[in-house]
Design a protein with these regions (language model features):
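Hydrophobic transmembrane alpha-helices and their membrane-interface caps
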Residues: 1, 269-327
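Hydrophobic, glycine/alanine-rich multi-pass transmembrane helices and their short helix-loop junctions
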Residues: 29-71, 258, 355-403
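Single conserved hydrophobic/aromatic residue that forms the stacking wall/gate
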Residues: 412-421
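Internal alpha-helical transmembrane segments of multipass membrane proteins
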Residues: 33-42, 241-282, 286, 357-369
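Short helical (or helix-break) motifs at transmembrane helix termini and adjacent helical loops
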Residues: 1-11, 28, 65-67, 309-330, ...
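Helix-loop junctions and hydrophobic alpha-helical segments within the transmembrane domains
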Residues: 7-33, 333-351
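Structural signature of multi-pass, alpha-helical inner-membrane proteins
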Residues: 46, 81-265, 271, 290-301, ...
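Juxtamembrane helix-loop transition segments at the membrane interface in multi-pass membrane proteins
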Residues: 1-16, 59, 73-92, 323, ...
């Protein structure tokens, strides 16, 4: 995007590429660093698979940053020096004039944006108060059983078979790896210390699913068909829940502090904090609103928290790009009205924002549709978070920063009524 902007200014291809990389470096560095901060928080407060996810996230971000900044530039420069890239345009006939020279008055729509955001918050608070959350065994305590059958089975049918036996307790059945293997989760009598509880539960599983077990005996079922067992006691679940809470809170604080240190402007920090908090709360509220309605598991577990923290990092990426452009435009036109500066920054980064969000959403949608039930909940949270995070950058983070600046008179002199209506 930066190179295309330089080309539109009439610069040569070589100069455009050099200046594009130069001007984009700070935004790319900031956005990647915020995601790495999220990764380290996950690494500290996560357990088991979440630590693995955090490690993968950090390594992939570092690799992506290195290739985006250095490797791609080396390729472009090598191609230009050999005369093979002389006809590069970085556009197609469709994208050439797409979203160029837009003049959307984002700040003029800030009251509408605030109203919609408040309405969403009210709905989500109502859902959390009435329905609560469908907590997985990571947070509520419980047992997991991975069961392999001799033929493909449907999780919904297995769940219906087992409901009478586990009435009054949570029960979740999802497909993992293949159609003949499911994971059954329940918090049935998790607080009891009776030594016979495990045998009682496995007996209930065997009796409840007898119609799909064929001629398998109880011994064959427990020894061969149950692939794995996992128990999370109430005290461990409480520890995981506390760790997840602090992971989210510390991520929000870390992002706000980094933005404050990077841009030296409290309004940017508050705007970022409000935006990512709104995004995270929207995801939590949506899971409260839709669990039991959508045909896949919407449990609140460690994977769900990982999705929220990843979305927080992603949302900050967009916000950092916009704030970096505001700082750049302000440096070029120090006496320009603050509303014009912010609207110009939002419009000039709109193509980049939408391209990044759309490409990410397409990948997540493919994973959501083609992936298994195990990651469907995670990808759904990510997909929804990308959409809400993009919208909150445009209609929550930046307008809040503007309102703080306008009210405290931290920047410029007097806003133009024409541009702030």
């Amino acid at each position: 995007t930066g190179t295309k902007e330089e080309l539109r200014l009439g610069k040569s291809l070589k100069s455009s590429i050099a200046d594009g990389y130069k001007h984009a470096f700070s935004a790319i560095f900031d956005s990647n660093l915020t995601t790495i901060i999220t990764g380290f928080i996950l690494l500290v407060y996560g357990t088991g698979p979440i630590k693995g996810f955090a490690t993968t996230l950090i390594v992939s971000i570092l690799t992506s940053f290195f290739t985006a900044i250095f490797i791609t530039r080396l390729i472009f420069e090598a191609g230009l020096n050999r005369g093979k890239f002389n006809n590069l345009t970085f556009t197609t006939h469709i994208s050439k004039n797409l979203l160029t020279n837009t003049r959307i008055n984002f700040l003029g729509m800030r009251k509408i944006g605030f109203t919609v955001a408040i309405a969403i918050i009210v709905v989500m608070v109502g859902s959390l108060a009435i329905r609560g959350l469908n907590q997985g065994i990571d947070f509520s305590g419980g047992r997991n059983y991975v069961v392999r059958f001799d033929k493909p089975v449907k999780p919904v049918e297995i769940s219906e078979m087992l409901k009478p036996a586990f009435e009054g307790s949570s029960l979740s059945v999802i497909t993992i790896t293949s159609d003949d293997q499911v994971r059954i989760s329940t918090n049935y009598r998790i607080a009891d210390q009776d030594e016979n509880i495990d045998k009682e539960i496995e007996t209930k599983l065997y009796e409840g699913m007898k119609s799909v077990l064929g001629d398998a005996s109880y011994e064959e079922f427990t020894e061969n068909m149950i692939q794995s067992r996992q128990k999370v006691g109430p005290s461990i679940a409480d520890d995981i829940k506390v760790g997840a809470f602090w992971a989210v809170i510390l991520s929000l604080i870390a992002m706000a502090l980094y933005i404050l240190l990077r841009f030296r402007d409290i309004s940017f920090s508050v705007g970022t904090l409000a935006s990512v908090a709104f995004t995270a709360f929207s995801i939590i509220g949506l899971y409260s609103l839709l669990y039991g309605i959508l045909p896949f598991s919407m449990e609140m577990d460690q994977s769900f928290i990982a999705a929220i923290l990843t979305v927080i990092g992603y949302s900050v990426n967009d916000t950092v790009v916009v704030f970096d452009r505001i700082r750049e435009v302000k440096g070029l036109y120090p006496k320009r009205d603050r509303a014009l500066v912010i609207n110009d920054a939002l419009n000039s980064t709109l193509t980049r924002t939408l391209n990044t969000s759309l490409s990410t959403a397409i990948v997540l949608l493919c994973i959501f549709i083609l992936g298994g039930d195990v990651i469907r909940s995670f990808t759904f949270a990510m997909l929804f978070g990308v959409i809400v995070g993009t919208a909150s950058t445009l209609f929550v983070a930046t307008p809040i920063a503007y309102e703080i600046q306008r009210r405290s008179c931290l920047l410029y002199t007097s806003p133009s009524p024409r541009d702030t209506r």
